[in-house]
Amino acid sequence: MASDNSAKRVVYLEDIEVKPSKGSATKENASVAVTEETTDGSTVVDTDASTTVTEKKTTTGATKRQKAITDMFTKKSSSSSSSSSRSGPLPKKARSDTPSLNSIPFSLKEYQDSLSEEEKTLLTLECETLGKSWLKLLKDEIKKPYFLTLKRFLAGEGVKGLNDSAPNLKVYPAPKNIYSWSNMTPLGRVKVVIIGQDPYHGPGQAHGLCFSVPQGVAIPPSLRNIYAEIKAEYPSFEPSKHGNLTTWAENGVLLLNTSLTVRAHEAASHSKRGWEEFTAKVVDVVDRYGGANLGDKSSSDAGRGRGIVFLVWGAHAAKVVAKLDKKKHLILTSAHPSPLSANRGFMGNGHFKKANDWLEEKYGPDGCVDWTKL
């Protein structure tokens, strides 16, 4: 007989969750949970549950769907959808070959059960903290030899589990924050990607989002220049007194460094260890599914990536996006906002308004980012 586990398949629905409430404690488990018993006895469960809706089999064997399920996945359409016409359908081949994001099943327990004992140890942090909409598409990547080698290196640096806080741990950000970007910005809600290089290497600065620092930490010079450019584009913006960009992340801005850890006081100390290969795969996943749940949910290409905005500042970021389809995505390039280069093309680049103009044209007003809200 098949085990109970083999009869289960799990679909994580965090991508279609509305923006988390501002007061949420961790913002890491903001998924809607749906448990559904189907006619074949299989189960669909979102285990990051904050709300659960159950479907039970009827005596005729048909599935009785509760209204809550309908409310989650359908929306009454008007006579015509302007956002659908803006987005345009995917080519027929793309629609048939690419499953919709929320239809891809993933069971964390079954995945963990499939790991060797060493893999279970090395990948504990990924299984516990990598956002599930990302993990289900990166699960094979993190089992590759290069990534396991990276994890062995990090273990030697003291990064092993979620709550590592030994006095001699001098790696930033804290392990629990390495994958913050994946929890604050679910894959299907990505609107914009901003690419950094490696985390800030001073105490208390890095928290898993590029260019961002926790409240109470001095605003870095590059971020001050970013604020100055937003002020130039949106004159009503009053530059924040803090440098925490969490609100952007929650509003669909993926703040991704290409190296996700760094040794204290040693810039680029964890580069060329494997992170760049991993984050290149993250960009590939974004290329395929970023923004999959934006815009009209009833269109034939819903659930698949239809294009997003990449803000590419500096030569390093330009290399990361070099192979992306410029017809599918809006790729805006300029100098880096560092004080060393900001006046050579970053200031005055108009990127923030250009991004919103493109997003609104493609997805409607809900596709825009409020850059002035921090």
Residue ranges and their predicted role:
Residues A2-Q112, N251-L374:
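Glycine/proline-rich loop-helix segments at beta-alpha junctions forming the active-site rim
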Residues E110-T121, L125-V309, H316-K319, K327-T333, ...:
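A polyanion-binding, active-site-adjacent surface
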